[in-house]
A protein has these predicted regions:
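Mature N-terminal, pre-catalytic/accessory segment of carbohydrate-active enzymes
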Residues: 12-152
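Bacterial N-terminal signal peptides
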Residues: 2-13
């Protein structure tokens, strides 16, 4: 009885609150959308990234190729099953919870459980979630295109 209650509590605990701490700056990218594409290119398919950004897959492909990324590589089922901690870490300072959940294809309960119970992840992430504005795709301006060429 106690173990069932404990499991129920663990599975229904809410996500930790966001802090007032701003996300880590990413001055080496033209904007957060470019950083998002760069960090997720080998881990998440373009369709999912586009869905999170409110873009078309072609937009994500164009951004990746403009920064010199090849492919995209095939995302195997093994990568989809095993890369979730890397995906969380790479996007912790880029995405609000809602978009992170959409990227992972998870529920709030799944993410909350993973943060608490999987490999001390909440501690490793600094025991806080910065307040990140939602990412929304917009076509890159001339300055962003120039920076894309420098990155490539």
């Amino acid at each position: 009885m106690i173990s069932i209650t404990l499991i129920t509590l663990l599975l229904t605990a809410p996500l930790p609150a966001t802090s007032d701490t701003p996300p880590v700056a990413i001055p080496h990218f033209p904007d957060a959308v470019h950083a998002f594409v760069w960090r997720n290119w080998p881990l998440v398919d373009c369709e999912r990234m586009a869905q999170v950004l409110g873009a078309k897959p072609e937009d994500v492909l164009r951004l990746g190729h403009a920064m010199g990324l090849e492919g995209p590589p095939p995302i195997t089922s093994e990568v989809k099953d095993r890369a979730y901690i890397t995906i969380i870490r790479r996007n912790w300072h880029l995405l609000p919870y809602e978009q992170l959940l959409e990227l992972l294809g998870w529920t709030e309960e799944e993410l909350a459980y993973t943060l608490r119970e999987d490999d001390f992840l909440w501690i490793k992430l600094g025991s806080m979630k910065p307040t990140c504005p939602p990412l929304k795709y917009t076509p890159p301006d001339e300055a962003a295109q120039a920076r894309e060429k420098e990155i490539a």
